[in-house]
Design a protein with these regions (language model features):
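Short, acidic loop-to-helix structural element flanking the phosphoryl-transfer center
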Residues: 14-46, 52, 56, 68
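Substrate-recognition "cap/lid" segment bordering the active-site pocket of phosphatases
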Residues: 45, 50-106, 111-120
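Short, acidic/turn-prone active-site loops that include or flank metal/cofactor-
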Residues: 72-79, 128-132, 149-152
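Acidic, Mg2+-coordinating phosphoryl-transfer loop and its flanking beta/alpha structural elements
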Residues: 106-146
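Short amphipathic alpha-helix with an adjacent loop that forms part of the alpha/beta core around
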Residues: 152-160
Length: 160
């Protein structure tokens, strides 16, 4: 039953996305371009509660899907903190076992994203584009906070 639901959900998501107004937030594409152009030590991954197929449908709609080399998705585990562990394992498969947790940066817009990073000893950049303001996100222990990704350069992120 669950797989049938997600199959139907993903189908309708693909049908309806072109009919709704949505945009890639300012700064996202610039940062993705900067990180992609960076040396091989920077690898982009996606950690989301969406299923892999739903994430693919959403990101393809905005021409972002091909930017990420690895990921952890809602169909990998229902607990966001476990997704962080899965993403870390997958990153080590791509980069190598020498990857340290503190070299991982999770960018998100909720206290749960900050907690997710903390659960594996990673850094976090909290972006106040969702339902939480910068002060709330900073108080959760984010390594850094910005109002929007357009407010920070790739080099600054790499120094976090």
């Amino acid at each position: 039953l669950e797989s049938s639901f997600f199959h139907v959900y993903t189908h309708w998501l693909g049908e309806l996305l072109p009919q709704v107004e949505g945009v890639v937030l300012p700064g996202v594409c610039g940062l993705l371009n900067a990180f992609t152009a960076h040396d091989a030590t920077v690898q982009l991954g996606l950690l989301t509660g969406n299923t892999r197929l739903a994430a693919e449908v959403k990101l393809r709609h905005f021409d972002l899907w091909g930017r990420f080399k690895l990921g952890a998705f809602g169909d990998d585990h229902t607990c966001r903190n476990e997704l962080a562990s899965i993403a870390e394992r997958r990153a080590k498969q791509v980069i190598g076992d020498s990857l340290l947790s503190e070299e991982i940066l999770i960018i998100g817009d909720t206290p749960r994203d900050v907690e997710c990073a903390q659960s594996i000893g990673a850094k976090s950049l909290a972006v106040a584009t969702g339902n939480f303001d910068s002060a709330t996100l900073q108080n959760c222990g984010a390594t850094g906070t910005v109002e929007m990704l357009a407010d920070i350069h790739a080099e600054e992120i790499l120094r976090l």
